[in-house]
Regions:
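Switch/communication elements of ASCE P-loop NTPase nucleotide-binding domains
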Residues: 1, 131-234
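Phosphate-coordinating catalytic segments in nucleotide- and nucleic-acid-processing enzymes
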Residues: 1-167, 234
Length: 234
C-alpha cells in the first residue's frame, strides 16, 4: 500500500475506528484514521503501562528474502513501504541466538521445529545473508529455500535469540500459508506447548478449516480454553 488511508474501505462513509477495553483499569487501546491519512494515525490512545513481554507479528509472507530491502526502506530511504510490524520483525531477527540462556520449553520446541524443516536457517555475518543448512550439512541460499521452511525458521530464530519470553504475545497471519498439513500440525503443537509452559499468548488468523480442526483437537487435550472468533458478512 502507498499510504495508511488505503486500509480504509473505499465505500466507507467514515474513517476506520478501533477501540479495545481490557478488564484492567487504564488499559484501553483506541485509534482512528481516514482515507486521506498518509502515514500517521489521526487519534490514538494507548495504555501507559506496557506488557513485560515482547510482542511480535508474523505475516503470511516470510520476510527473510526481503530482509535487506525492508531494512533499507526504513533506515536509509525513509520510505513508507513496509509497516512497523515488518520492521519490528526483521529487527528482532537481527538478534543473534543466545547460548546457554534459553528456556527448556523453547529448546524442546526448537528441536521439534528442526525435525519439521530437516535442518535450520541461519545468518552469515560475513556475507550478510540468510542461508538454509539441511541435516546432511548442505547449504542453500535463502532464495532457493522453500517458503514453508523459511516461515517456520522465523519462529525458531525468535525462540533462540531470547526475543520471546514469558508473557510474550505472538500474532500470526494465515499460519497455514506455504505449510503442508504435517507441518501445520507440528507448528500448532509447538505453539500450544510454549503457550502452556511459558504463558505466551498466541493470536492466529486463518481461512483454513484444517487449522481450526487441529486447534479443536488441541483444546480437547488440555484444560485451557482455545477461543475461536468467526467473522462473517451480514
Amino acid at each position: 500500500t502507498d499510504k495508511l488511508g488505503d486500509l480504509v474501505t473505499r465505500s466507507a462513509a467514515e474513517g476506520l475506528t478501533f477501540k479495545m477495553q481490557s478488564d484492567q483499569q487504564d488499559m484501553a487501546l483506541e485509534y482512528q484514521f481516514s482515507q486521506s491519512a498518509a502515514s500517521k494515525v489521526g487519534t490514538a490512545v494507548a495504555p501507559a503501562a506496557q506488557k513485560p513481554g515482547n510482542s511480535i507479528f508474523l505475516p503470511a509472507k516470510e520476510v527473510l528474502s526481503l530482509f535487506p530491502i525492508i531494512l533499507k526502506s526504513r533506515e536509509v530511504d525513509r520510505s513508507f513501504g513496509f509497516d512497523d510490524t515488518y520492521y519490528d520483525l526483521v529487527k528482532a531477527l537481527q538478534i543473534a541466538p543466545s547460548r546457554g540462556k534459553n528456556f527448556s520449553a523453547f529448546a524442546d520446541a526448537r528441536e521439534e521445529l528442526s525435525h519439521v524443516v530437516d535442518g535450520k536457517v541461519d545468518f552469515d555475518d560475513n556475507s550478510g545473508k540468510w542461508y538454509y543448512k539441511n541435516s546432511s550439512g548442505q547449504k542453500f541460499s535463502i532464495g532457493a529455500t522453500a517458503e514453508g521452511v523459511k516461515k517456520i525458521s522465523i519462529m525458531d530464530r525468535l525462540l533462540a535469540n531470547g526475543y520471546l519470553s514469558k508473557d510474550s504475545v505472538i500474532f500470526i497471519d494465515e499460519l497455514e500459508s506455504a505449510l503442508h498439513p504435517t507441518a501445520i500440525c507440528k507448528f500448532l503443537d509447538m505453539l500450544a506447548q510454549v503457550s502452556k509452559e511459558m504463558g505466551i499468548q498466541v493470536f492466529i488468523s486463518t481461512h483454513s478449516y484444517f487449522v481450526i480442526k487441529k486447534m479443536y483437537l488441541i483444546a480437547l487435550k488440555q484444560p485451557e480454553a482455545v477461543t475461536c472468533i468467526s467473522l462473517s458478512r451480514g
